[in-house]
Every structure is written in structure tokens, then in C-alpha cells.
Amino acid sequence: MAIERTFSIIKPDATRRNLTGRINAVFEENGLRIVAQKRVQLSQAQAEAFYGVHRERPFFNDLVSFMISGPVVVQVLEGENAVARNRELMGATDPKKADAGTIRAQFAESIEANSVHGSDSAENAAIEIAYFFAGSEIVA
């Protein structure tokens, strides 16, 4: 199995409810190491650029508004097959469809306020990590 890195965001709905530690515990208890982490308040420009792939989708403006509504925690997670493992731990985007025990089943409020974002591929993980972190900020 390959050791890889993935990118994660703990979203405003979760930071607002002080769930960062509980979500971090899920990652760590399931074989993912947090090798970089910082709490940030996204600007509208940052959120629009980060989610630019969704610009033409009907939910884009609501997504950006939500992501700037409060602080987020951006993270680099490392472990065996980290991208796939993180996606398993997060659960389905819609918390009503998420398997019991997943982060979204436990903590999400709605399909929009679903507590976490995770990279969908190793390629996108590299892009997303570079968007928020300099190489020197990642400490394995």
C-alpha cells in the first residue's frame, strides 16, 4: 500500500460547534496522520478560486457564502491510501446517505453544511495542498 497525502477542510459548521478535535480524532484513530494544519478565515476570492471548478454549477454562490461564513481548518493528512481512506471516513456528501459512523453521519447538519471536504484524487490533493500550504509547513 502506498503512503500518500490528501487535503482536508473542516468546514464552518463544524468549527462553529467546536468539532475540530473530534474530527481530528477520527482521522488519527483510523490511520491518518495530520502533518499540517491551520485555522483560517477564507476570503471570498480564496473560496471562489478554490471551488472554481464548480463556478458554473447552480450551488456555487451558496457554497462560497457558506465557506466564508466562519473559520475553517485546512489540513494535510498522510497515510496508506490517504485519499481513499479519508473519503471513506467522511462518508457520502449527503449526510442522510452517509454510512453510520462516518464523519458526515455523525456531525453534518445538511448536504451543504456537511462538516468536511476531502480531495477526490491524488492529483487534486497535490493542487489543493499547494493552494494552502508551503512545503516547509508540512512536517512529517
From Swiss-Prot:
Its localization reads: Cytoplasm
Residues bound to ATP are 11, 59, 87, 93, 104, 114
Which reaction equations make up its catalytic activity? a 2'-deoxyribonucleoside 5'-diphosphate + ATP = a 2'-deoxyribonucleoside 5'-triphosphate + ADP; a ribonucleoside 5'-diphosphate + ATP = a ribonucleoside 5'-triphosphate + ADP
One term under GO cellular component = cytoplasm
Q: Which UniProt keywords apply?
A: ATP-binding, Cytoplasm, Kinase, Magnesium, Metal-binding, Nucleotide metabolism, Nucleotide-binding, Phosphoprotein, Transferase
Query: Which coenzymes or cofactors are required?
Result: Mg(2+)
Molecular-function GO term, any one: nucleoside diphosphate kinase activity
Q: Where is the active site?
A: 117
The job of this chain, per UniProt, is described as: Major role in the synthesis of nucleoside triphosphates other than ATP. The ATP gamma phosphate is transferred to the NDP beta phosphate via a ping-pong mechanism, using a phosphorylated active-site intermediate.
- Family assignment from sequence similarity: Belongs to the NDK family.
In Swiss-Prot or TrEMBL terms, this protein is called Nucleoside diphosphate kinase
Instruction: Give the species this sequence originates from.
Output: Granulibacter bethesdensis (strain ATCC BAA-1260 / CGDNIH1)
